[in-house]
Amino acid sequence: MRYISDLHEGDQVSEIYLCKTKSPGTSKFGKSYYSLTLQDKTGMIDGKVWELTNAIGHFEAMDYILVRGQVTSYQGSNQLNIQQIRKAQEGEFDMADYMPSTKKDIDGMFKELLAMISKTKNQYLKQLAEKIFIEDKNFAREFKVHSAAKSVHHGYIGGLLEHSLSVAKICESYANLYPQLNRDLIVMCALWHDMGKVEELSSFPENDYTDEGQLVGHIVMGAIKLDRLIREIPGFPPKLANEVKHCMLAHHGELEFGSPKKPALLEAIALSQADNLDAKMETFAEIMEEQKEDQEWSGFQRLLDTRIRKTSI
């Protein structure tokens, strides 16, 4: 199979890809065309069908399609100029080739998560973590393979677990550096800070926002679930319950970034910084992975609000 990550400008392509999105458009000359997003397990590529001829068969978004065309460059990124399309038939493709996945061992990461829970001394936080990640086996199974985003960072199978574990590790290092931070509170809140994404985003291959995800969002969805689980634990201290929910509600840091509350606890401040750091590190890494070998600087990156390049050493 010719993977998207291996495509270069000028390449002729005849391959089956998953059509994630299909949008009709009209050029400035009044001609109709299609904009597509094509995906395999190595990434995505923008596709353009400029000529809607008989060579373009009927297909819809989320179909597997055989495309023929040429790779061009547009604003520093690869784009596929498509001349022919037909819907792929069963047996012509293996779905595993089209599901992007973490490079890390999922079971190994989940064992690390469980080890963090076992180290927790606060009985209420430990019980809450066990309810989420151990007792609710359906949730745990989904959490392990879910993505953390539709497209921004960790948008692949195992991405949610990878991101949550990384944020928890950063928070653990913060707690070691700053003794005024409560380790149990910040690390446990890091592990479950994005738990709402299991319901906010649908599973692969769609990996798109659900109706509840669009209307409510993962932060509020996670806080609602936390509140319900906390009420099931006898004697859970009300102040601690509020602190747990606050860390969830404030983990995006700023109101304009989607947080219903700004951080008002040390642990909430540190968690929001750790979350932002890991997201930006992964975003940077994913951009660099897609960068052409002969390209030093990237194009303007809206998510980072600047152009970027790798360091020289």
Spans of model-derived segments:
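Short, acidic/hydrophobic/Gly-rich beta-strand patch recurrent on exposed beta strands
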Residues: 35-40, 203
